[in-house]
Amino acid sequence: LLGNLSEPLLLRAYMSNRTHPLLAPLIPQVSDMLKEYEIAGKGSVITEAVDPVDFPELEAEANQSYGIKASPFQIAGRYETAVVNAYFSILVRYGDQSIVLNYPDLIEIQSSGASSNVKLRNIEYDLTRAIKKVVFGFQSIDSILAELDSPAKLTLYVTPDFLPEDYAATSDL
């Protein structure tokens, strides 16, 4: 699957450094799994793990383009209870196709009495399934043009202000 990519595949983990104590140990596991995909992709897979709080432009892109938002997590201490807003999502993007895996897609919570155990679901399966969906959902311009019955004609309307200097002076345009 990763060996036949015609475009770069982006796997970006949005993980907050300040998060729920039960999620914190999972962040290195997610980063390690992404690195495995990067190695298997042999240059066609780009992986990133970012804390959106440190990168406001990536946070804005995540919120506006992909609907990724911080989730409120309740932290209960011995004498106090607090709520922390944290990111725990993975973006899978290939060409114009994208899928977001949010924390309910990534973790499994097992409660027994007063304690809870949080672990990653089968992240390799979930990531591979998402990659397969975006890769097979994407059609490159080459493949779209190859399916046309007749040659395509492209008409471009450009004002001289947006042309390179060499072409702007040409009166033939």
Model-derived features: positions:
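Short, surface-exposed patches at the edges or C-terminal ends of soluble domains, predominantly
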Residues: 1-173
